[in-house]
From Swiss-Prot:
Protein name in the entry: tRNA N6-adenosine threonylcarbamoyltransferase
Cofactor info, note text: Binds 1 Fe(2+) ion per subunit.
Name of encoding gene: tsaD
Entry superkingdom: Bacteria
Catalyzed reactions per annotation: L-threonylcarbamoyladenylate + adenosine(37) in tRNA = N(6)-L-threonylcarbamoyladenosine(37) in tRNA + AMP + H(+)
GO cellular component: cytoplasm
Keywords for this protein: Acyltransferase, Cytoplasm, Iron, Metal-binding, Transferase, tRNA processing
Sequence similarity: Belongs to the KAE1 / TsaD family.
Chain sites annotated for binding substrate: 136-140, 170, 183, 187, 275
Coiled-coil intervals: none
EC number: 2.3.1.234
C-alpha cells in the first residue's frame, strides 16, 4: 500500500488530495480539500495571476493540514504536484511546497501534468479506466485524446485552433452581462431558454475540416454580432443557442473519434464536463453509438488535488521514476507529457 499526497495550484484553486494505491492497482481517495480564490477575481472579470499566487501562499498550509487530518495520515509515501500547465507564479507555490515536503519527509517527488490529472479523476467514481477516447474540456484547454491506460503515453488526436470551450463560455457570459466566472451561470440561464430559437454556427464541422479539431472563436463572434443586431434578444435563448452549439460540436467529434478508433468507452473530463447540456447530449449520443460514457461527478471535474493524487498513483503503479527536486515548472506543458522527470 502506498499513500500519495498531491498539491494542485495551477490556477485559482488550492487543492490538496491524498490517495491510497493498493497492491492490486486500485486507487482510493482518502482526502480532497480545496480552497478557492475565485471571489477575489470576480471584480476583475478573470483570474489575476498575482492575486492567485498570493492566495495559494495563504491557503496552502491550512488546506494541507485539513487534508492530512481528514485522511488520518501523518507522513505519505509519495508527494506529487502539478508541474504544468498553468499560471507560472501559481505553479511555483505548489511545486516549491511539494519539494519541501518531499525533502523533509524523505519521500519521492512526482511532478505531474495537470491535464492528466483531469483524466485520472474519474477513477475514484467509476474504477479503473479502460482504453478510451477522452474529451478534455476546461477553461484553457480543449483536446481529443487517445488513452490506452493512465500509465501509458497519451496520444493527442486534435485540439482547438483558437479559443478553448471554457474560454468561449466566459467570453459569452461577459457579453450577456453574467459576470465571472460565467460557465455555471450561463448553464443555469440556458436551461430556461429555447435552444432551437437561435442557431449559431458550428466551427470546424465542414467536410474539409480536420475531423478532431475545434474552433470556438467564430462562435463567440457570432454571438456578439447577434447581440449587436438584436438589442431586444432574450438572453436565455442566446445562452441556450450558444450552449447547444458548443455541446453539439464537442460530443459529435468525440463520438466520431471513438467510433473511428474502434474503442467502446468515451471519457469526458475537465471543468466544462460539469456542464448540464454537454452531459445530457453526450449520454444520448453515446447510447445511440453503443459507447460507454464516463464523466466524473461535477466536484471532480473542477481543479483539485485529488485528481493529481490519482494520476501520480497511476504513474507510480506503472513504474515511472520520481522527478528530481530541481525540476522546473512548465506553464506550457503539453498534454501528451504526463510527467516531468
Amino acid at each position: 500500500m502506498t499513500t500519495i499526497l498531491a498539491i494542485e495550484t495551477s490556477c485559482d484553486e488550492t487543492g490538496v488530495g491524498i490517495a491510497r494505491l493498493d497492491a492490486d492497482g486500485a486507487v482510493t481517495l482518502l482526502a480532497d480539500e480545496v480552497a478557492s480564490s475565485v471571489d477575489e477575481h470576480v471584480r476583475f472579470g478573470g483570474v489575476v495571476p498575482e492575486i492567485a499566487s498570493r492566495a495559494h501562499l495563504e491557503a496552502l498550509g491550512p488546506t494541507m493540514r485539513r487534508a492530512l487530518s481528514a485522511a488520518g495520515v501523518t507522513k505519505p509515501d509519495v508527494v506529487a504536484a502539478t508541474i504544468g500547465p498553468g499560471l507560472a507564479g501559481a505553479l511555483l507555490v505548489g511545486v516549491a511546497a511539494a519539494k519541501a515536503y518531499s525533502a523533509a519527509w524523505g519521500v519521492p517527488f512526482y511532478a505531474v501534468n495537470h491535464l492528466g490529472g483531469h483524466l485520472a479523476a474519474d477513477v475514484y467514481q467509476h474504477g479503473p479506466l479502460p482504453e478510451c477516447v477522452a474529451l478534455l474540456v476546461s477553461g484553457g484547454h480543449t483536446h481529443l485524446l487517445q488513452v490506452r491506460s493512465l500509465g501509458d503515453p497519451i496520444v493527442e488526436l486534435g485540439s482547438t485552433v483558437d479559443d478553448a470551450a471554457g474560454e468561449a463560455y466566459d467570453k459569452v457570459a461577459r457579453l450577456l452581462g453574467l459576470g465571472y466566472p460565467g460557465g455555471r451561470v450561463l448553464d443555469e440561464l440556458a436551461r430556461t431558454g429555447d435552444r432551437e430559437a437561435i442557431v449559431f454556427p458550428r466551427g470546424m464541422t465542414g467536410p474539409r475540416d480536420a475531423p478532431y479539431a475545434f474552433s470556438f472563436s467564430g462562435l463567440k463572434t457570432a454571438v456578439a454580432r447577434y447581440l449587436e443586431s438584436h438589442p431586444d434578444a432574450v438572453n436565455a435563448d442566446v445562452a441556450a443557442g450558444f450552449q447547444e452549439a458548443v455541446a453539439d460540436v464537442l460530443t459529435r467529434k468525440a463520438v466520431r473519434a471513438a467510433t473511428d478508433l474502434g474503442v467502446t468507452t468515451l471519457l469526458i473530463a475537465g471543468g466544462v464536463a460539469a456542464n448540464s447540456r454537454l452531459r445530457e447530449l453526450a449520454e444520448q449520443r453515446c447510447a445511440a453509438a453503443g459507447l460507454t460514457l464516463r464523466i466524473p461527478r461535477p466536484g471532480l471535474c473542477t481543479d483539485n488535488g485529488a485528481m493529481i493524487a490519482s494520476f501520480a498513483a497511476h504513474l507510480v503503479a506503472a513504474g515511472a521514476p520520481p522527478s528530481p527536486l530541481d525540476v522546473p515548472t512548465d506553464p506550457g506543458l503539453p498534454v501528451v507529457k504526463a510527467q516531468v522527470s
